A protein has these predicted regions:
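Short helix-loop-beta junction
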Residues: 36-48, 90-91, 213-225, 301-304
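Glycine-rich phosphate-binding loops that contact phosphosugars or nucleotide phosphates
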Residues: 13, 17-169, 355
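Non-catalytic alpha/beta scaffold blocks inside enzyme catalytic domains
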Residues: 127-155, 294, 301, 306, ...
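Internal helix-turn-beta structural module
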Residues: 308-309, 314-354
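Acidic catalytic cores of enzymes that act on phosphate-bearing nucleotides/polynucleotides
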Residues: 1-4, 11-12, 149-152, 165-301
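Active-site-proximal helix-loop elements at catalytic-domain edges
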Residues: 1-6, 100-102, 313-321
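Structural beta-sheet core signal
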Residues: 23, 69-71, 102-103, 196, ...
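Cofactor-/ligand-binding subdomain signature composed of acidic, glycine-rich
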Residues: 1-19, 336-343, 347-349, 355-364
Length: 364
């Protein structure tokens, strides 16, 4: 499953950003898309992005004229996807919409087979790319293109990381090696829980993507029969420094925290504290100043308490830098898996849960 290191750039269909994009998928077929829409989407994209993941019914959901459909599933067999397909087909107006775009393996899987029979455009996920490693397939590039953002720059960021790994030199190669070494050393000392805490609300969904990547790849029975792995914890700085920080500092010493910040100039703003504000000095500050101080304050408090901290700074919140970050972590996960003598690219226990679900539903 090492195909995630080869980044193709297939032609993408033109989607209208002024119309809703209904994205049916879950897990690795949704989280990269959700990450990029939340990171880069404007107000219009936020309104028009409609992820359809859980099989539960959404009250009062109706199709609208101009809705654009994407059905995304690497295997083409995802139960939640087929549930939403059935639900959408039963709604008034489905037959008036353009044929859905499919993002899946271009093989004989049920989704691809249905798509070919119904005139759908198929954007392929390479067979050798695991679902949770699919950010650099159309799972990631299609929503970027829909929003009018630079999908090529996103891929370029990923390629830069892979290029440095292949020649075994460069800042990304060094950062990846240092991170792997730190996490392995922590693992040997019993620190198996790690928090990713970006100080940027736009990166909240990036933490969700990272959680799946880490948990599904590295929670395994190793070759020697021992249970190994890491437990990832999702957080976002401006929120969770007021909630989870207490446990991290005063609770069991079995975790570390990755504090992620974004550098670069912020758009200027004016703060006008009212009379009686306990913080009149806000008039000379901006929100970005406060966010940076919070990140440094939290990091300092964690380090003073003896909690391992990995500082990770993005030079800018743009497609290239986010692409590089996501590719770096895919590489980190692969290297950690091999070092722990487990397969980071399978998920047998997930498959067991699916089989039990199908049996209970009488679906196979």
């Amino acid at each position: 499953m090492g195909g995630w290191r080869k980044l193709a750039e297939p032609a993408l269909p033109v989607l209208d950003p002024a119309q809703r994009l209904l994205w049916c998928g879950i897990g690795g077929s949704l989280l990269p898309s959700e990450t990029l829409v939340r990171a880069f989407g404007n107000d219009r994209a936020a309104r028009n992005w409609v992820p359809l993941a859980s099989p539960e019914r959404v009250p009062e959901f109706q199709l609208q004229s101009g809705d654009q459909l994407v059905f995304a599933s690497k295997s083409g067999k995802t139960l939640e996807l087929w549930t939403w397909m059935a639900r959408l087909r039963a709604l008034p107006g489905f037959g008036d919409l353009a044929a859905p775009v499919l993002v899946t393996q271009d093989d004989a899987n049920p989704l691809a087979t249905w798509g070919r029979a119904n005139g759908c455009r198929i954007l392929p996920i390479p067979v050798e790319v695991g679902g949770r490693f699919s950010a650099f397939t159309p799972i990631g590039t299609l929503p970027l293109a829909w929003m009018g953002h630079d999908a090529s720059a996103f891929l370029r960021g990923g390629r830069e990381v892979i290029g440095q790994i292949e020649v075994d030199r460069g800042p990304w190669r060094d950062r990846i090696a240092a991170t792997v070494e730190m996490l392995l050393d922590a693992h040997r000392r019993g620190l198996t829980e790690w928090v990713l805490m970006p100080y940027a609300m736009r990166l909240d969904s990036l933490s969700a993507w990272w959680v799946q990547l880490l948990a599904e790849s590295l929670g395994k029975v190793a070759k020697d029969g021992t249970r190994k792995g890491f437990t990832p914890i999702r957080a976002v700085g401006p929120v969770d420094q007021h909630s989870q920080l207490q446990r991290w500092m005063a609770g069991p010493r079995n975790l570390g925290v990755i504090v992620m910040t974004v550098e670069g100039a912020q758009a200027p703003e004016k703060l006008d504290p009212p009379p009686g504000s306990p913080y009149p000095g806000l008039a000379s500050l901006q929100g970005g100043d406060i966010l940076r101080a919070q990140a440094e304050g939290t990091t300092g408090a964690l380090e003073a308490a003896g909690v391992p901290v990995l500082r990770w700074s993005l030079p800018a919140l743009d497609e290239r830098e986010v692409g590089a970050f996501m590719m770096a972590w895919q590489a980190i996960i692969g290297l950690l898996g091999f070092a722990l003598e487990l397969d980071p690219f399978d998920q047998p226990e997930v498959e067991d849960g699916k089989k039990r679900t199908f049996k209970r539903l009488g679906l196979g």
